Amino acid sequence: MLLHIKQVLTSEELREARGILADAPWGDGRITAGSQSAHAKNNEQLREDCEETRALQQLLLRGLERHQLFFSAALPKQISPPLFNRYGGASNSFGNHVDSAVRFLRDGSGRVRTDISCTLFLAGPDEYDGGELVIEDTFGVQRVKLPAGDMVLYPGTSVHRVLPVTRGYRTASYFWIQSMVRSDEQRRLLFEMDNHLRHLRSQYGETDSGVIGLTSTYHNLLRMWLDV
């Protein structure tokens, strides 16, 4: 499932993030790449342990906490600490690759199975040319270039790439989610059911017998498929 989530960050939060990024210490993005993706990766990245990264992580996670759509779609069990990258100039692209199945946390606190990959755009599409995120999966080939503050979720199993940036700079955050429901197909079905339930609640109310019955079915399926 590929999902566009709008306005994860407010305009005020975006201004704050851009202010932090303006003075951030960018370095070679290959330091976090796996053995295969290191050959394809040509971008810049903030160090995981720098003050700017920590401030941006708190800002982004606060934004995620507000979004019911995000929780409905991802059913997150664990979210890896968000990282931040930049494409432009001589460091302007990332060739075809698949994310590693497991992300080991830098502080040694554990690991995250990368069920879902996430990219949150911090630069608007008018600020750079090129830089589309191209994702290949069962839904076909999708080219993604979103407004600043918007985010895309897609399966961690997808082959994807970032096309060369030929003008300006493309800044973004990226991170991974270990979901309580491992299967992408099962998550999609639960997400669709949850969307339909919200519509039915708005039409018929919480006490309608059909709404209660479908809510029970949703939670029974969730209980069956949960990996906690």
UniProtKB/Swiss-Prot annotation:
Domain called Fe2OG dioxygenase: residue spans: 78-179
InterPro entries: Oxoglu/Fe-dep_dioxygenase_dom, PKHD_C, PKHD_hydroxylase, Pro_4_hyd_alph, Pro_4_hyd_alph_FE2OG_OXY
Chain sites annotated for binding 2-oxoglutarate: 170
GO MF annotations in UniProt: 2-oxoglutarate-dependent dioxygenase activity; iron ion binding; L-ascorbic acid binding
Pfam families documented for this protein: 2OG-FeII_Oxy_3, PKHD_C
EC number(s) from the headed UniProt entry: 1.14.11.-
Alphabetic keyword roster: Dioxygenase, Iron, Metal-binding, Oxidoreductase, Vitamin C
Cofactor needs: Fe(2+); L-ascorbate
Broad class of enzyme this protein falls into: oxidoreductase
GO biological process assignments: DNA damage response; intracellular iron ion homeostasis
Sequence positions that bind Fe cation: 97, 99, 160
Superkingdom of source: Bacteria
Cofactor comment text: Binds 1 Fe(2+) ion per subunit.
Name of protein: PKHD-type hydroxylase Vapar_1809
Record organism: Variovorax paradoxus (strain S110)
Organism classification: Bacteria, Pseudomonadati, Pseudomonadota, Betaproteobacteria, Burkholderiales
